[in-house]
Amino acid sequence: MINTRKSHPLMKIVNNAFIDLPAPSNISSWWNFGSLLGICLILQILTGLFLAMHYTADTATAFSSVTHICRDVNYGWIIRYMHANGASMFFICLFMHVGRGLYYGSYTFLETWNVGVILLFATMATAFMGYVLPWGQMSFWGATVITNLLSAIPYIGTNLVEWIWGGFSVDKATLTRFFAFHFILPFIIAALAMVHLLFLHETGSNNPTGISSDADKIPFHPYYTIKDILGALLLILALMLLVLFTPDLLGDPDNYTPANPLNTPPHIKPEWYFLFAYAILRSIPNKLGGVLALVLSILILVLMPLLHTSKQRSMMFRPLSQCLFWLLVADLLTXTWIGGQPVEHPYIIIGQLASITYFLLILVLMPVASTIENKLLKW
């Protein structure tokens, strides 16, 4: 008799995706982040659901409702801080996951990669709208600054911004719609993640060598289930260390001041995971130019398969490309630091240099290095 997990219509899907899935025998811990992102998403949806039970999306009561969650709701403080710091863990995993894809040439799975880029945009949009909900000073001014960027779009810009606001400034209508979108988007992300997985399972996983692993596959369970559980335990450990010891480490003190349209904070800045993009935005003195650079800094990922000039898929055996990759990582860390600094000398010039280096590395230096490495193969 055939096994139930192989015959049952629903169990069959789960079995083929997580149990009997043939996986490469040599995938390293860099392949753990996909499952960790799934865990982060589930955690965010669950904590978010419980927060939504007590939150009110109204300018008069939003800030108070968050205070009420932290003070009066049973274990409300831990739910709130798990949600806030869970977003940080989510983005750490996202950056690692994308970095892994760049290093090992996983972007050659076109559909999987492009759905992944859409997932990245959707997650960034969700995080931005979530940051607005507590209705603190940084929530309000962050929303004002970022939505205002759309006014740089020629001809329709101003109308578009007012349409998004639902009025002539960030107000009650804006907060209500942001809450609605912040609630629905994670479910869209979950659906997209399933599409992401569907496309991945059409080709099978990449591996550190970048060579086909069809000749050497092992079942996902128990080998990678146990490996994913270890990863999950480490993720939860890191998250709970943050939540229980330094819950406000990654937040902005300004967000503990209720939103006041009449008082602008001295330094408006987003959460840490957007600082690199914010630095690129600020480094261009022109509004439209800055917005374009901001969008392109993420959208450039779509071009990665086109910019791949190497005869090898992975960077494992390409020392020149490896150096440039880690230079790119250092560059992004520099820009993350700059994005959190005030707009003054020497930070302005450092930010501009970091932004130029970022685009130069991806568009010019890395493809050229790959071509040189191809030539070196003939020696």
UniProtKB/Swiss-Prot annotation:
GO molecular function, one term: ubiquinol-cytochrome-c reductase activity
Binding positions (a ubiquinone): H201
Species for this entry: Nanger granti (Grant's gazelle)
Pfam families for this protein: Cytochrom_B_C (PF00032), Cytochrome_B (PF00033)
The name this protein goes by in its record: Cytochrome b
Residues annotated as transmembrane: 33-53, 77-98, 113-133, 178-198, 226-246, 288-308, 320-340, 347-367
Cofactors named for this entry: heme b
UniProt entry tagged with the keyword Calcium: no
GO cellular component terms listed in the entry, alphabetical order: mitochondrial inner membrane; respiratory chain complex III
GO biological process annotation, one example: mitochondrial electron transport, ubiquinol to cytochrome c
Function: Component of the ubiquinol-cytochrome c reductase complex (complex III or cytochrome b-c1 complex) that is part of the mitochondrial respiratory chain. The b-c1 complex mediates electron transfer from ubiquinol to cytochrome c. Contributes to the generation of a proton gradient across the mitochondrial membrane that is then used for ATP synthesis.
Membership in a protein family: Belongs to the cytochrome b family.
Chain sites annotated for binding heme b b566: H97, H196
Comment field (misc): Heme 1 (or BL or b562) is low-potential and absorbs at about 562 nm, and heme 2 (or BH or b566) is high-potential and absorbs at about 566 nm.
Binding residue positions for heme b b562: H83, H182
Subunit structure: The cytochrome bc1 complex contains 11 subunits: 3 respiratory subunits (MT-CYB, CYC1 and UQCRFS1), 2 core proteins (UQCRC1 and UQCRC2) and 6 low-molecular weight proteins (UQCRH/QCR6, UQCRB/QCR7, UQCRQ/QCR8, UQCR10/QCR9, UQCR11/QCR10 and a cleavage product of UQCRFS1). This cytochrome bc1 complex then forms a dimer.
Keyword Electron transport annotated: yes
Cofactor: binding comment: Binds 2 heme b groups non-covalently.
Subcellular localization(s) per the UniProt record: Mitochondrion inner membrane
Major place of residence: mitochondrion
Keywords from the UniProt entry: Electron transport, Heme, Iron, Membrane, Metal-binding, Mitochondrion, Mitochondrion inner membrane, Respiratory chain, Transmembrane, Transmembrane helix, Transport, Ubiquinone
Membrane topology field: Multi-pass membrane protein
